[in-house]
Amino acid sequence: MTWTFLSHHAHVLILLAKNPEETIDQLAFACGITSRSIVSILNDLEAEGYIARQRVGRNNRYSINQDGPLRHPTSFHHTVGDLIEALGSFGDA
């Protein structure tokens, strides 16, 4: 497979919508990328206000800003919530 329809950032958001307590290693395995790449993506998403990170013991819990606009010029009128709703409802496994 040489390309996909969704970016790794989108995959991470969808996975976090399904399980906000997913670990970096679990996200990396599910996305097929390195843990270091996941950390970079999480930092990007947090810096832009798409997710918030809360420390719970030794782990993090992530909440998603569903109202955050998509970034591409052709889809900026849609939100992160729209994307997640279209591809997998919040909390669905």
Task: Give a label for each model feature.
Residues T2-H9, T23, R55-F76:
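Short, cationic-aromatic polyanion-contact patches
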Residues A10-I14:
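Pre-recognition alpha-helix immediately N-terminal to the DNA-recognition helix
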Residues L15-N19:
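Short amphipathic alpha-helical elements of helix-turn-helix/winged-helix folds
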Residues Q26-F29, E46-A47:
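Alpha-helical residues within the helix-turn-helix
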Residues R36:
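Key DNA-contact positions within bacterial/archaeal DNA-binding proteins
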Residues S40, D44:
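Alpha-helical DNA-recognition elements
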Residues P69-A93:
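Amphipathic alpha-helical dimerization/coiled-coil segments
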